[in-house]
Amino acid sequence: LRDLGYDVERIEKRARTRIRYTQKKFSPQRQLAATAALEHITAIMADGLLRNDAYMADAHPALARLWRWHALEETEHKAVAFDVYNQVCGSRKLLRRAMLMGTFFFVLDTTRGLAHMLKVDGLLWNWRVWRDGIRWMWGKEGVFRPLISAYLDFFKDGFHPWEHNNLDLLHATREEFDGAPLIQAGAA
């Protein structure tokens, strides 16, 4: 990304600053609630990626494989922080508030990163790029639209991440990687 002109250090610094602030100002229970909430977001995104090959259809094969592996990893541990949180604290109110705040900052930070990359590419003010991007994310066949229901499930009383049972998908995807290194020598 640096070679393409993106200021990776700036993006990483913003993330480090947010993490340090959270560690300084938030209780351990609130930090754990935020982790559980954000893990739900990454889990439902991972599920979407694993279910829809079209999302990575135009990606370089090594990059597509890396993203599938990462989605697999996110799926495997999707309930760990949630289960620990329930044992340690268990407040649904705090968990819901953490999801709302986590969602806000997730959207804010990813939009800032996207805007930086579009600016570097000279596309920040290209309305067609924004229109097409919004359609790709939220349109009828968009990436995020199918995730709305799973996202909202988090706010239900008694919800647990494994209620979105995708063990079949997890096992099928794991078969792609068992016995094979993520990036083989000479690949890429």
Regions from the PLM with identified roles:
Residues L1-A188:
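Non-heme di-metal
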